[in-house]
């Protein structure tokens, strides 16, 4: 497990993240796809970062590889957020974190990409749980996302 601290993630933030994730989880596949479509809407050039989208004539919203990738990224991001306070750190398996870091490094993912992704994630969650969305919930998810990104960035180096 990564040892990046979950300090500063309060009980209230945890409750907001857990409550919203409980409401979203049954629709994780659909929400994951919406999340990625938002990323590509904001930054169309981001599509070039995904090898499985190159030379594909399948519309993004129907692309099975994108759907699968989007769901796994959305699930990993949300599950990481939910357990942050309890574990006291980002708990993505160490091997996964190393793989994520190496992959993001290899594809040239930069800070701007992480910012676009954060914005798209927060917008996706806001649309998924409009009745409970609040500035506090936005901050809680933003904080959890920032901790995950910091853990990934620590591993952003060539794979060995």
Swiss-Prot record:
The record marks 138 as: Homodimerization. Binds 1 heme group per subunit. It is found in: Cytoplasm; Nucleus. One of its GO terms (cellular component) is cytoplasm. Heme b binds at residues 51, 65, 69, 99, 103-104. It holds the Pfam family Globin. It comes from the Eukaryota. Its EC number is 1.7.2.-. Its cofactor is heme b. Residues 8-157 form the Globin domain. InterPro entries: Globin, Globin-like_sf, Globin/Proto, Leghaemoglobin-like, Leghaemoglobin_Fe_BS. It catalyses: Fe(III)-heme b-[protein] + nitric oxide + H2O = Fe(II)-heme b-[protein] + nitrite + 2 H(+). Phytoglobin that reduces nitrite to nitric oxide (NO) under anoxic conditions (e.g. during flooding or in waterlogged soil) and upon root nodulation. Required for general plant development and during nodulation, especially for the onset of symbiosis. Monitors nitric oxide (NO) levels during early phase of the nitrogen-fixing symbiosis and buffers oxygen in functioning nodules. May not function as an oxygen storage or transport protein. Has an unusually high affinity for O(2) through a hexacoordinate heme iron because of a very low dissociation constant. Belongs to the plant globin family. This is Anaerobic nitrite reductase HBII. The gene is HBII.
């Amino acid at each position: 497990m990564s040892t990046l601290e979950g300090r500063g993630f309060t009980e209230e933030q945890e409750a907001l993240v857990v409550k919203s994730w409980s409401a979203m989880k049954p629709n994780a596949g659909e929400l994951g796809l919406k999340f990625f479509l938002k990323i590509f809407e904001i930054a169309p050039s981001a599509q070039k970062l995904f090898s499985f989208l190159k030379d594909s004539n399948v519309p993004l919203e129907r692309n099975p590889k994108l759907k699968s990738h989007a769901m796994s990224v959305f699930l990993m991001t949300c599950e990481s957020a939910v357990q942050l306070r309890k574990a006291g750190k980002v708990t993505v398996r160490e091997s996964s974190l190393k793989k994520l870091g190496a992959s993001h490094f290899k594809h040239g993912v930069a800070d701007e990409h992480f910012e676009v992704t954060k914005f798209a994630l927060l917008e996706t969650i806001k649309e998924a749980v409009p009745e409970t969305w609040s500035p506090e919930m936005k901050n809680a998810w933003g904080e959890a996302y920032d901790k995950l990104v910091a853990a990934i960035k620590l591993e952003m180096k060539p794979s060995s």
